[in-house]
Amino acid sequence: MSVTAAKGFTAAGITAGIKESGSPDLALVVNTGPRRSAAGVFTSNRVKAAPVLWSEQVLKSGEVTAVVLNSGGANACTGPKGFQDTHATAEKAADVLGTGAGEVAVCSTGLIGVLLPMDKLLPGVEAAAGQLSEHGGEKAAIAIKTTDTVHKTSVVTRDGWTVGGMAKGAGMLAPGLATMLVVITTDADLETEALDRALRAATRVTFDRVDSDGCMSTNDTVLLLSSGSSGVTPEYDAFAEAVRTVCDDLGQQLIRDAEGASKDIKVEVVNAATEDEAVQVGRTIARNNLLKCAIHGEDPNWGRVLSAIGTTDAAFEPDRLNVAINGVWVCKNGGVGEDRELVDMRYREVHIVADLAAGDATATIWTNDLTADYVHENSAYSS
């Protein structure tokens, strides 16, 4: 049920004609209240798409009534006209829903540098409003796909309240956030401050640590909306855990659907001096193309892990480094460890542990292997 699993939300997903393929390309999510609290986090890319600039302003009020999402065009690097088009999209949604444009967030995904076909998008907003349903969450999730092969949803239900979400993303997966559009809804009765705190805490250890290809999008948006319709105000820790669970689930789905990937790689850094250094080392390992190629070839090449670690400024002694691949400590104290022939890499999941022996901090980064399919898909993608 995705974003409509929580009470107080309706959604729709339609084909507006934005995509030449004729696939669904426009989604609408509406908070019917009584509360309309909202929080959001956005790309840290300095080149921000028009809908990101618009939605950042909308979120300053802490209230969102509706979210319009389109696939088939990013509306990024489109100048003043692109921002005007985003404003017009919000105005159209506000008009048909009877609210203000300042309470309508807008999200776009697709090709950068191309204006959206507003003659199709604006009528599409009206058509989507006419199809809003408490059961429309799945259709909305399908409508925001680009190179995704599957739509991505997650739901967690606790004692009298629910958190549900949908996400898109398959390429340009790297922090801040990953290339993603995410809408998370809850019927827990919470104010904006609690939503913002929980969302930022969750994204820091989930979406911000998904790093498939090291490329950062211009359009990343994660929104958390509360309708308050359950009438239940949960303890903050319980709510934050539920939000983190949904974000983690959606983040794992992003990795499993990454463009061209044949291996999902969990890079776990342990015994680092600080968490920041653990993240730095994990990200450096995850972005090492030589290692990603080795994993694709089912080669437990621990030397490439050590080489990657050595390019960081994290605290460690080279002769104390240990590396395990799928449970086999192939590197011990900076040299040869257990027999690499013991490493079973036939399956999709690959787990790398890098032990820095420098402290007690840990961090995990998720990535993929590098394949010919990834190169083909991104060389064939129009630019």
Curated annotation (Swiss-Prot):
GO biological process: L-arginine biosynthetic process; ornithine biosynthetic process
Keyword annotations of the record: Acyltransferase, Amino-acid biosynthesis, Arginine biosynthesis, Autocatalytic cleavage, Cytoplasm, Multifunctional enzyme, Transferase
Root EC class: transferase
EC number: 2.3.1.35, 2.3.1.1
Ligand binding (substrate): T146, K168, T179, E259, N378, S383
Active site: T179 (nucleophile)
Location, primary (coarse class): cytoplasm
Statement: the UniProt record of this protein carries the keyword Coiled coil: no
Gene3D superfamilies: ArgJ beta chain, C-terminal domain, L-amino peptidase D-ALA esterase/amidase
Gene Ontology molecular-function annotations: glutamate N-acetyltransferase activity; L-glutamate N-acetyltransferase activity
Site feature Involved in the stabilization of negative charge on the oxyanion by the formation of the oxyanion hole, where: T109, G110
GO CC annotations on file: cytoplasm
Subcellular location(s) per record: Cytoplasm
Biological or metabolic pathway of the protein: Amino-acid biosynthesis; L-arginine biosynthesis; L-ornithine and N-acetyl-L-glutamate from L-glutamate and N(2)-acetyl-L-ornithine (cyclic): step 1/1; Amino-acid biosynthesis; L-arginine biosynthesis; N(2)-acetyl-L-ornithine from L-glutamate: step 1/4
Annotated site location: Cleavage: A178, T179
PANTHER family: ARGININE BIOSYNTHESIS BIFUNCTIONAL PROTEIN ARGJ, ARGININE BIOSYNTHESIS BIFUNCTIONAL PROTEIN ARGJ, MITOCHONDRIAL
Cited function: Catalyzes two activities which are involved in the cyclic version of arginine biosynthesis: the synthesis of N-acetylglutamate from glutamate and acetyl-CoA as the acetyl donor, and of ornithine by transacetylation between N(2)-acetylornithine and glutamate.
Stated family: Belongs to the ArgJ family.
Quaternary structure, from the entry: Heterotetramer of two alpha and two beta chains.
HAMAP family: ArgJ (MF_01106)
Protein name as annotated: Arginine biosynthesis bifunctional protein ArgJ
Natural source organism: Streptomyces coelicolor (strain ATCC BAA-471 / A3(2) / M145)
